[in-house]
From Swiss-Prot:
It is found in: Cytoplasm. It comes from Bacillus subtilis (strain 168). Pfam families: DUF3378, RNase_HII. Manganese or magnesium. Binds 1 divalent metal ion per monomer in the absence of substrate. May bind a second metal ion after substrate binding. PANTHER family: RIBONUCLEASE, RIBONUCLEASE H2 SUBUNIT A. This is Ribonuclease HIII.
Amino acid sequence: MSHSVIKVSLSAIDQMKMTYSGSLTASVPQGAVFQAKPPGCTITAYQSGKVLFQGKNAAAESARWGTAEPQEKKKTAKKPADPRYAPPADIAGMSVIGSDEVGTGDYFGPMTVVCAYVDKTMLPLMKELGVKDSKDLKDPQIIEIARNLIKTIPYSLLVLKNEKYNSMQEKGMSQGKMKALLHNQAITHLLRKLDGVKPEAILIDQFAEPGVYFNHLKGRDIVKERTYFSTKAEGIHLAVAAASIIARYSFLMEMDKLSRAAGMTLPKGAGPHVDEAAAKLILKKGASALRTFTKLHFANTQKAQRLADKKRS
């Protein structure tokens, strides 16, 4: 598909939104200001000022607004600074425990951490089930694949609900430390489930340098043997991709529960649409309700409160 990306000011984005008002979509992707679908093109404008044009008329439509940015090279996985924790070159064919988390950047909803064990004999089946980087999958695909995975492979799931998350954060614990604790705990649980089966490697989708990760775990029993780290680990071994899919599935199920409790659909992400939803929740249930539904330390809390105050006046 032909595509083009331009960078414009927020005022230009407002002008674009007015221009395409007749073709705006009802919902927008995470982080987007608007999405429109004029003939032959899908236009998505983001809060960063970047605007993505896709479709046969992408070049012509983007030329109305600015010069396309040069396309960036696809980012590759980043290995940790300490080579001891870089995954082996042949890890893709090994029996591996993969660990990943979801929900850390979402204002509404919990943090879910999953580690999953994929024996090398199961790798062909993982591909057959459609296991791949969860960012390339839509929610209905995530749900379908995850429901097959949880019946097929050993895994450990931990859900850090919002009230507990907020309590830990208010006591001074960083999100990075929470993630380290949950990953280590999930891996420990799964190793117990495996009952003596030894994975050839443990691969964690890297969110901190290994030294920082292990420092967060001081004073605790740490799973360190054959443990490796890499960013974009979903593309390195299918165990991490499987863990990410199950974690995303769990997050979606938790969001459904929270939406039912709130009496409204709670959106993913942390953009302006989330501020609006949080303001609506404040007006409906009071500001104290946010503790149950959100990560309070996000800037969205103050923005939502201001919006709610404006709506009241």
